[in-house]
């Protein structure tokens, strides 16, 4: 119905599975060792949790094979605040499985003291389950090879009316919801590549409807217009599998009101071409860079907080708690020194440990601004900050105290962070790993193996330009999954991981399942997996309708 607040739909599940098998994930899943691993996990899981199939009254495989076409799950609300659930499954010729499933539902409801009746809604037969322990008793329709389950007679009548073609003008459908259609228009793909799955979520309408009569919740909701959050409309998107030239494409759209006010007025994104900085190595697994007009956002923040706290109160708090104690002016000395570009890169610090992935953040500064001197003065106030130099680059290393390690103790599975702060060119660079910092400075000084010069990044960047058309990017991302996948394989295959699972298997059935599976598992080689991998990227566009994200992964060049 029109007032649907949450929705997930797979247009055709068998086609979805077939297309998924053409993607990197599907091809990795077809690896002999991965298939053996998953088969072992499935068997061990069902052995550890026999109640699943006992409750279903059929093998899990049989239930999973039921959908033969569209699958849709939705949640809608009524004007009085009731929540209605909806499930649709095209089961095709799987009528025997459907009958078995409904037979088991009959048994469960009757065993609970409920009843099972058949009623006619217009010209359609509806199975009504009256469950005394659940107010949302299901109603089931079986028609034209399709199973529909609802939890509200209003929803049932709505479905039947549209199915029979007798719907009135008041019985509007979700396809008439302007928020939904606007989001889907931004997420439809091309004629050659239609979405295989789509989704939608409208949290404000859901909360507003379900908190009727709750004074505290309604009081909180009444604040939203004051801070501008009532301008958040909804979000949704789609997934396209194995379209021409790509592995996957995804769309996510956050719909925002025009004009933006309050909190939403802090989303003052700029634009840029996203060329990686000269200190970003080519072997980073992930790179994100975005543009945000901080000074404009800060002014809007002052306006917002003055509305909430009172005129001038925010500035008073900043003066008392920041400016005066540090002898600095937040607005003039820091905010105005930022050029509006922010970057995050990751790197895997060897050897493989649970937190081997480190991060580096770059904040671009305006040329000639005094922020550089102010920053160094503030860092020197930190007692555990040690000034160092590497490759003619000064930096500060934050010395985190660590307990002494006993002789003969095996290497820790946890990496001890070694934070660093530096001014590199016109950037503040912060990282949690000194090894990563030095690796980046090697790249910066040598000019070799830079991400900006890599063929993989150039390819992703060109596809981003193609996706943008006339638009401008406010944020771009780049990812190459090899090192992260290698880290996962190293951790999974580590004897200490197996020992941990074995030691805790008696206290957790699930850990016991993992212990049994991993104890005898043969892991695939990296070469077998990486031939199915290719770089991926995404872009964020800030326009008058809201924020739109386009993500994609490329088809791998195999063999």
Residue locations for each model-derived region?
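Structural boundary/hinge residues at secondary-structure and domain interfaces
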Residues: 1-128, 132, 175-236, 241, ...
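Short, Gly/Ser/Thr-enriched beta-strand-loop segments that form substrate-interacting elements
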Residues: 122-136, 393-416
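A conserved glycine-rich beta-strand in the N-terminal activation segment of trypsin-fold
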Residues: 136-210, 410-511
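Short, exposed beta-strand/loop patches in secreted or surface proteins that constitute
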Residues: 116-120, 138-141, 239-241, 384-389, ...
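Ordered core of a single globular domain
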Residues: 359-363, 427
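C-terminal regions of mature proteins
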Residues: 522-559
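Extracellular or lumenal secretory-pathway regions
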Residues: 17, 168, 526-527
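Active/binding-pocket-proximal capping segment
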Residues: 364-396, 444-453
């Amino acid at each position: 119905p029109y007032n649907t607040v949450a929705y997930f739909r797979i247009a055709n599940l068998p086609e979805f599975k077939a297309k998924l098998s053409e993607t990197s994930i599907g091809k990795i899943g077809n690896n002999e060792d991965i298939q053996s691993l998953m088969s072992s996990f499935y068997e061990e899981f069902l052995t550890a949790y026999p109640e699943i199939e006992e409750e279903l009254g059929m093998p899990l495989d049989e239930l999973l094979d039921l959908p033969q076409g569209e699958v849709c799950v939705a949640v809608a609300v009524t004007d009085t605040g009731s929540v209605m659930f909806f499930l649709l499954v095209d089961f095709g010729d799987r009528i025997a499985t459907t009958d078995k499933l409904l037979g088991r539902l009959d048994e469960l409801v009757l065993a609970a003291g409920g009843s099972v009746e058949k009623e006619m809604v217009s010209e359609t037969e509806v199975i009504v389950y009256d469950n005394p322990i659940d107010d949302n008793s299901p109603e089931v329709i079986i028609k034209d090879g399709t199973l529909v389950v609802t939890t509200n007679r209003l929803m049932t009548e709505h479905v039947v009316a549209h199915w029979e073609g007798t719907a009135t003008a008041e019985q509007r459908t979700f396809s008439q919801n302007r928020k939904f259609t606007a989001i889907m228009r931004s997420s439809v793909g091309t004629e050659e590549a239609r979405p295989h799955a789509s989704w939608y979520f409208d949290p404000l309408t859901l909360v507003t409807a379900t908190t009727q009569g709750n004074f505290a919740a309604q009081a909180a909701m009444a604040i939203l217009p004051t801070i501008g959050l009532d301008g958040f409309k909804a979000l949704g998107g789609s997934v396209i599998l194995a379209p021409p030239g790509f592995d996957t494409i995804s769309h996510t759209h956050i719909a925002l009101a025009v004009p933006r006010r309050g909190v939403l007025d802090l989303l003052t994104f700029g634009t840029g071409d996203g060329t990686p900085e000269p200190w970003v190595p080519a072997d980073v697994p992930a790179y994100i860079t975005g543009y945000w007009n901080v000074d404009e956002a800060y002014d809007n923040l002052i306006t917002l907080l003055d509305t909430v706290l009172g005129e001038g109160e925010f500035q008073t708090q900043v003066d008392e708690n920041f400016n005066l104690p540090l002898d600095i002016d937040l607005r003039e000395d820091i905010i105005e020194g930022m050029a509006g570009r922010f970057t995050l890169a990751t790197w895997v610090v060897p050897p493989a440990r649970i937190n081997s992935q480190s991060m580096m953040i770059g904040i671009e500064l305006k040329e000639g601004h005094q922020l550089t001197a102010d920053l160094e003065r503030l860092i020197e106030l930190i007692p555990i900050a040690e000034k160092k130099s590497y490759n003619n680059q000064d930096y500060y290393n934050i010395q985190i105290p660590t307990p002494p390690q006993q002789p003969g103790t095996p290497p820790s599975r946890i990496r001890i962070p070694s934070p660093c702060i530096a001014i590199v060119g016109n950037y503040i660079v912060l990282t949690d790993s000194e090894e990563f910092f030095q690796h980046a400075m090697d790249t910066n000084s040598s000019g070799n193996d830079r991400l900006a010069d890599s063929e993989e990044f150039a390819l992703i960047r060109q596809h981003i330009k193609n996706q943008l058309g006339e638009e401008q990017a406010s944020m771009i991302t780049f990812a190459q999954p090899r090192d992260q996948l290698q880290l996962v394989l190293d951790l999974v295959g580590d004897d200490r991981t197996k020992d941990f699972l074995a030691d805790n298997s008696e206290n957790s059935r699930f850990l016991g399942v993992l212990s049994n599976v991993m104890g005898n598992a043969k892991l695939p080689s990296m070469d077998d997996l990486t031939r199915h991998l290719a770089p991926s990227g995404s872009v964020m566009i800030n326009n008058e309708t809201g924020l739109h994200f386009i993500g994609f992964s490329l088809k791998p060049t195999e063999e």
